[in-house]
């Protein structure tokens, strides 16, 4: 897209894993890679701005329920059984699905965020991470403390 218009029949020159330019007549020796884009689409990566990625594991669990009934009677009790390892693998599944669909970055608010960060780094996807907080409640300070720790450790954003 140039000046807000879709452009067609372009070459993409890649250098050090980054798009360098769109040359009209590329010379192979000048670039690490040239992608001939005939019958293809190149577009920026998508960003999912509200996720609870490890919840992919709850897909189709107790469908067709009212939100609060679903949360209070199904999801929140199930989340009490989550741990670092389960969140890592749930996040890994979510990232495979995101990347396959063109998502290259996400914003997640859930729990066990160190596990989510490890999975994101391994998958090569970028993310902003925070411990999810829904009101302060009885465990509010714990969630705030977890977010401060994420920030101090530098895992509030995945490194990919």
Say what each PLM segment does:
Residues 96-104, 159-160:
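Short, surface-exposed connector motifs at secondary-structure boundaries
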Residues 106-116:
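Divalent-metal (often Zn2+) His-rich catalytic cores of metallo-beta-lactamase-fold enzymes
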Residues 104-105, 126:
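Short acidic/polar active-site loop segments enriched in Thr and Asp
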């Amino acid at each position: 897209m140039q000046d807000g218009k879709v452009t067609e029949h372009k070459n993409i020159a890649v250098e050090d894993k980054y798009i360098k330019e769109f040359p009209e007549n590329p010379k192979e020796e000048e670039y690490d890679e040239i992608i001939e884009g005939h019958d293809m689409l190149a577009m920026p990566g998508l960003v999912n701005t509200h996720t609870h990625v490890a919840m992919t594991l709850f897909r189709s669990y107790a469908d067709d329920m009212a939100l609060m009934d679903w949360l209070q009677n199904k999801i929140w009790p199930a989340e009490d059984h989550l741990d670092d390892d389960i969140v890592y693998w749930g996040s890994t599944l979510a990232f495979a699905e995101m990347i396959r669909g063109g998502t290259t970055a996400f914003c997640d608010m859930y729990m066990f965020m160190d596990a989510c960060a490890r999975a994101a780094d391994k998958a090569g996807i970028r993310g902003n991470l925070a411990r999810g907080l829904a009101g302060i409640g009885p465990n509010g300070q714990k969630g705030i403390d977890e977010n401060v720790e994420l920030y101090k450790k530098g895992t509030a954003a995945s490194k990919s």
